[in-house]
Amino acid sequence: MAMETQDIIKRSATNSITPPSQVRDYKAEVAKLIDVSTCIGCKACQVACSEWNDIRDEVGHCVGVYDNPADLSAKSWTVMRFSETEQNGKLEWLIRKDGCMHCEDPGCLKACPSAGAIIQYANGIVDFQSENCIGCGYCIAGCPFNIPRLNKEDNRVYKCTLCVDRVSVGQEPACVKTCPTGAIHFGTKKEMLELAEQRVAKLKARGYEHAGVYNPEGVGGTHVMYVLHHADQPELYHGLPKDPKIDTSVSLWKGALKPLAAAGFIATFAGLIFHYIGIGPNKEVDDDEEDHHE
């Protein structure tokens, strides 16, 4: 992918605006497609992520499931999720690669109060700039997928970057390169949507009538998409939300109420200025002067 697609179009806690849809270059937008029907849960993608990003999580404890590590962390940016479900009287073992979805309308970026701590590139990748992170955790609350994780060692938040450093020089993400079954694909979003529809058609031909593409509209679509056997029940895949949306409080705080808050601050500041000009500064009165007036 060309370097020019790395132009930043959004920064947290700034007034940068997303270009209108009619002028966005969809050919420049990238996406990762994960076909859960061909994933074997080998965790090669987890290892590749750890190796490329030079992150090492602590050795955990067995909690009675195949998930290892048991959850995402500041040092585990992707994990395999294993779920058992019964469909039509048959047991199904569903596997899903979990990690940042790189939303087109990222709740983490909207919620973040630190200027430039979270950015979004023109190609759709959402990236954390750790040097600007203040560790407030608002991005965690703003994410409808519960992805960002706080590192207690440096009090900064981390997540999958979609290997933005590799993508910027024309390489695919490390997890895509290492997948032995070709379950993970990478390219332009247009290409990935076309490929996803082909995979869905094959799944439906095999009897999965509810197969579909997971690209939720509630967050403007995502740059990490899934092909699911049971797209009508995404929650079967370890709680994947059916209709994820940015929390109303975040939308109000950083949306409709933001101008009001700014106006309130300006009005307060102006009031202080007028008070100073019209009345002058408050004077301190000592005890002797106060007794004299009495």
Curated annotation (Swiss-Prot):
[4Fe-4S] cluster 2 binds at C49, C160, C163, C175. [4Fe-4S] cluster 1 binds at C39, C42, C45, C179. Induction: By nitrate under anaerobic conditions. One of its GO terms (molecular function) is metal ion binding. Keywords: 4Fe-4S, Cell inner membrane, Cell membrane, Electron transport, Iron, Iron-sulfur, Membrane, Metal-binding, Repeat, Transmembrane, Transmembrane helix, Transport. Residues 280-294 are cytoplasmic. Binds 4 [4Fe-4S] clusters per subunit. Residues 1-256 are periplasmic. SUPFAM superfamilies: 4Fe-4S ferredoxins. Its cofactor is [4Fe-4S] cluster. GO terms for biological process: anaerobic electron transport chain; anaerobic respiration; formate oxidation; heme oxidation. InterPro entries: 4Fe4S_Fe-S-bd, 4Fe4S_Fe_S_CS, FDH_Electron_Transfer_Unit, Formate_DH_bsu_Proteobacteria, Formate_DH_C_sf, Formate_DH_Fe-S_su, Formate_DH_TM. Its main location: membrane. The chain crosses the membrane at residues 257-279. One of its GO terms (cellular component) is plasma membrane. It is a single-pass membrane protein. The keyword Iron applies. Formate dehydrogenase allows E.coli to use formate as major electron donor during anaerobic respiration, when nitrate is used as electron acceptor. The beta subunit FdnH is an electron transfer unit containing 4 iron-sulfur clusters; it serves as a conduit for electrons that are transferred from the formate oxidation site in the alpha subunit (FdnG) to the menaquinone associated with the gamma subunit (FdnI) of formate dehydrogenase-N. Formate dehydrogenase-N is part of a system that generates proton motive force, together with the dissimilatory nitrate reductase (Nar). This is Formate dehydrogenase, nitrate-inducible, iron-sulfur subunit. It comes from Escherichia coli (strain K12). The gene is fdnH.
